[in-house]
């Protein structure tokens, strides 16, 4: 399955080609087509509208981090973060990663996770649900975060339907979406898809 998705950069090493895997959002789309729910960079779903339960609406939220935000914010030296990095190294080695470079690759991925956590809202900031209801069109989201092709990405996730730039999306964390643009711009694709 990993090979079908274009390979894992930390296993493929210098043989990894971006055009086989694509960007984070293209990989996310491929994973969704396989029945998985990839929400490691953003969480896109269709759910009941919180203000009108008779309607369904596309929802865009910050990701479910694989590790607790509080632990990630303490950096790579936190015991849980070290354990997660060791686990990632062990899996990559079992799949054939280069022993000399895998640690550096994992460090970059963990640093990305830490930076991603730093732009998410805390649990306390998310307690006021009225602040989590920010209807925007896909075109407006694209202005907040212009480097991600939001219309193409959202359409790739929707089975059997297509939307346009005027489609209303409930954005739960607009600040996150905006800050994500800068983070993705500074992070190599091979780190984003790892």
Please name every model-derived segment.
Residues 1-194:
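Noncatalytic, helix-rich "gating/capping" subdomain that lines the substrate-entry/channel surface
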């Amino acid at each position: 399955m990993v090979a079908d998705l274009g390979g894992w950069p930390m296993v493929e090493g210098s043989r990894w080609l971006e055009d086989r895997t694509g960007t984070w959002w293209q990989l996310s789309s491929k994973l969704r087509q396989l029945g998985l729910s990839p929400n490691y960079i953003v969480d896109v779903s269709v759910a009941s509208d919180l203000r009108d339960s008779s309607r369904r609406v596309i929802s865009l939220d910050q990701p479910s981090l694989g590790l607790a935000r509080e632990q990630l914010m303490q950096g790579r030296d936190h015991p849980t973060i070290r354990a997660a990095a060791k686990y990632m190294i062990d899996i990559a080695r079992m799949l054939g990663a280069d022993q000399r470079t895998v640690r550096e690759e994992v460090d970059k991925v963990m640093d990305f996770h830490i930076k991603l956590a730093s732009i998410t809202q805390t649990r306390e900031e998310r307690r006021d649900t009225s602040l989590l209801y920010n209807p925007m069109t896909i075109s407006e989201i694209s202005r907040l975060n212009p480097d991600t092709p939001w219309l193409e990405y959202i359409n790739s996730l929707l089975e059997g339907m297509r939307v346009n730039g005027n489609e209303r999306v409930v954005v739960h964390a607009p600040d996150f979406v905006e800050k994500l643009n800068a983070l993705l711009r500074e992070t190599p694709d091979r780190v984003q898809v790892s």
